[in-house]
Structure formats: C-alpha cells, structure tokens
Amino acid sequence: MKGKLAVAIIWHMHQPYYKHPQTSEFVLPWVRLHASKDYLHMARLLNEFPTVKVNFTMVPSLRDQLEDYARGADDEDTRVTMRTVEGTLTPEERDHMLARFFSIHHGNVIAQHDEYRRLLQLALAARGRPELLSDDYFVDLALWFNLAWIDPDDIAGDDRLRDLRDRARRFTREDVHYVIGRQRFMASGAPHLYRSLERDGRVEILTTPYYHPILPLIIDSRSARRADPSALVPDPPFVYPDDALYQLEEAVVSHVRGFGVKPRGVWPSEGAVSPEAADAIKKAHIDWFASDEAVLGRSADLVFERDDIGALVHPQLLYQPFRLTNGVTALFRDREISDRIGFSYGAMSPHDAVGDLIWKLEAARDRLPDDGGPYIASIILDGENAWEAYPNNGNDFLRTLYGTLAADERFETVRVSDFLDAHPPLVDLPNLHTGSWIDADLKVWSGEPAHERAWHVLERTRRFAQEQWGSLREMPPSVRQPLMVAEGSDWFWWYSSRNSSPEDRVFDELFRANCEVIWWYAGAEPPDELKQPLLDAGRIAAVAGESGAMLPGKREGYG
C-alpha cells in the first residue's frame, strides 16, 4: 500500500478483585503497587508524544479498587509497612515481609540498587531466623519495597523520592508515610488522567466485563468443548447468559460514571469470545470488540503465514476490521508483534526491539494491496505486567516506540473508534470461533480437575442464589457483588496447572469466600466443599513450601 498503515495499540489494564468480601480489606497489594508503577505513568508518558494516539482498557473492578485506595483504603502490606516504624512487628509479620517485600524483578530492579540488594543478601543469610534482623532493617526493607514499585520517572521527578533513593537507608516514620502517600495519590490520579486524555482525543478507553469473567463460560460452560471436545466441564453445566450480559451492562454504566462517555469498544476478558458472547456485546450496545488472530483463523479457516522475520506474508487477511452477522465489528491482534512486546523485547535494547517491530510492520505494509483497504494493524497486550521484564520499567522501549511511530510517515497510530468511523468494515465474518487469546481455546479457565471443582461450587452457589432471590438483577447488592466477583476469570486462571504463584492459596481462599458469603446472607450453612481448598493437593503442598524471600530464579508470579 502507498498510504499510511493504521496502527491500533491497546494496552490492557487489569488486576483481580482483591477486596475480601467478609472484611472489606484488600488482602494483596498489587493494585496499589501497579498504580505506582504503571497506571498513572503509562498515561502520563503520552504527554511527551502529542501526535501518538493509544487505546487503553481499564477494567471497571480495577477502577473501583483505585478509587477505594484514593479514599484511604489499606491493604495488609500497607499496614505492615506502617507498623515497621513503630517497632511492633510480630514474628509472623517479619516472616511475611521477608516473603513478600522482595517481590519485584530481581535483575531489573533489586540488582540496580545496592542497598536493596544488600537487604536481600541479609535476608538470605538469616533464612528462617528473622529475629537476627534489626527493627531498622525492616523499616528500610518496607520503604525500599514500596519505593521500588514506583516508576523510575516519577522518582526522578520528585525531589523527596529521589533523595530517599539516593540516601538508601536509615529511613524515618516521615519517609515511610511520604512514600505511601505518594502511592495513594497515584491511585487517585490515574483514572482522572485517562479521562482527560480521552476528552482531548488522545486516547480511547475500552471497557471489559465488570469483574473480568470469561463470557463464553458464563453463558454456557459447555462451550469449552467447542475448541477442545475432551475438556472436563461441570455437571450440571454453568448456564447463565443473562449474567454475562449484566456484567457487560454494568461495565457500561460504570464507564459512563467514571469517564463521562459510553464505551464503544470492549476487550472481552482474555479476548475470549463466542457467537453468544458477540450477541451479548451487541445487546449491551457496544460497537466493536477485539480478540486474537488465532480466533480469526479458526473462524474463517485461515492460516497466517509469516516470513523469516515474523512478518505476515498476506497481511490483508488479518489487518482489517470484520463485520459479524449481528452488525458488531471485530478486530484481531497481530499475535507475533503483541507477544514480542509482552514476552521478548525486554531482553533486547530499545533500539533493536523497536527496529524489529517496525521491520515487521514495514514488511506487512509493503505487501498490502494498494486498494484503499481499510487496513489496520492491531497490537494488543497487557499494559502493566510486561514492563517488569524491561530495564527502567519499559520507559526506554516505550519512548523509542512512540517516537519512532510519530516520526515515520508510513504509519499512523489511531484510536480504534475513530478509524472505524472513517473506515467501516467491508468484510463479513459469518462464523465466530469460541476461544481466547491463548491458543484460541478456553483451557486455561476450564478443563482440569481443579477447574471442574471450582465451576461445580460456583454453579451450586449460583443456583442457590437464583432459588433465593431470582435473577442476578433482582439480587440484593450484598449478594450480587460477590457472585459477580466469583464469576471472574482470575480464580480459574490460578486453578490451571499452567499457572502458579506464591499467592495460589490466597486466590483460592478469595474465590471460596465470595461464594460463602452468599450462603451466609441467606442464613444458610455453606456446603462443605467451600470449606476446604479447591487446589490440587500437590499445588497446596508446593505453595506451602514457598516461604522466605523470593529468590532469584524462582517463578515471579506476583501481581
């Protein structure tokens, strides 16, 4: 093609819902920490590139948690951090700090700060005997952990944070309070900055089903067998299509409340779609959705051939919008480029990484017919976790990427809805495969024994709630919310044998707790199966053995 190739970058912002339904306290700190490291900074970085346009998702349940922190909510790690300056830590809290407060990339963060590295070495030397470490040690560790989770640019731009980084030790109560206060400010500021950027035409904000459920599985859990006929599915099946629609409708309501406009696009949780999910998107009055190229391949019986550098040989098969039979528009991400950013480019220099990305786009553009298209390359991935694998929190890569795209006349970054307004889809997609961004199936969330146990107790709890109160829409909020939370994808992600973290037991407990409160609200005793872990026995033993500091080389499955 001779004109500019439109490039749609979509950064997905999501964390599980960490608020415990029985205590209303946050049991894990990752929303607060990612607000300090990613959410605010990813939006603020665009101020340096006024011609670059980007798309973001912000899951409604994530924005709820950010607002809670802005109003003064705490998590366990905040409270432990504050207690270090009182010198009143219990032995259990000291153990907890040694297990949690090195949970950040060792090579790209801890190793870059001599004092933080020294604290890790002392922790290793004192393994199993935290009483060997002084009260001052834990004050310094608390501040370093929280400081290290703040974006390096924000530290450099704040005189006091920069002074704390350079001083490196002997921190005070005032120092600790200042760092936590800055994190709270960042959580407060992030949604407002996104709203401002969208109002100025710089970004488009997509939505996601409210508590991040896998729509096809909420609609009918048997749909997992469409991509994998041998998948284990719960018996009786989980079949609540109106729950899926309600998760979408409430996401739209939340989006209007938070950002002042109705969302036009949606990234279905994990890019998981099905014909029925597309119909729910239509009913929620959302114009378009995005998923993965492999879903398109299975839908249209296409194979996306790539050359030696990973560029598409026939990019016109992927780089365009598609019109479904119900009128909804679909885009599908370039998996090669998206996954390179997410999993590979962090090990390369920014110059080489961006050069590789542009090389792929350039080759694809040169192969596109000069027929007016419309052609659009979609790059879609996690907008927070990827940067932990990059030096300097990915800032050097992002600046190089945005600067290169802004200067290269062959490409134009776009807000997706702007592009679709100017270039409606010309190609029909009569069939839509049921699958997600991972292998075009739903195996990560359904199909294993632990999955089956979790879906079974969720179905039993959902059926009980239906008998007590009727549909999800008719339930009292104190029942409806934990049920919607329990329908979220994250619990099932961690029940998969593919995924593990030091927090596996916490995720299991949160899932069961959200189910339990529904029974209690009705004055009923929860079933026995909710009173014991749903994880496989081997996983429980493995997680129980992961104590002490997170060591270099161990799986870094945090946040």
Set out the residue ranges of the language-model regions:
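Active-site and substrate-binding clefts of carbohydrate-active enzymes
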Residues: K2-D166, E305-Y558
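Short glycine-enriched loops at secondary-structure junctions
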Residues: M13-Q15, P209-I214
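Short, solvent-exposed turn/loop segments enriched in Gly/Ser/Thr/Pro and often Arg
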Residues: T57-L62, P209-H212, G265-V273, S417-L420
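Extended, Lys/Arg-enriched charged tracts that mediate electrostatic binding to polyanionic substrates
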Residues: R165-A187, P191, A294-L296, D301-F304, ...
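Structured, charged N-terminal subsegments at the starts of enzyme catalytic cores
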Residues: G181-H212, S221-R222
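Short, surface-exposed basic-aromatic patches at helix termini and helix-loop junctions that form
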Residues: R199, G258-F259, P275-A290, N395-D408
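CE4/NodB-like, metal-dependent polysaccharide N-deacetylase domain
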Residues: P229-E270, W359-I380
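Active-site-proximal helices and loops of the catalytic beta/alpha 8
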Residues: P275-D279, K283-P321
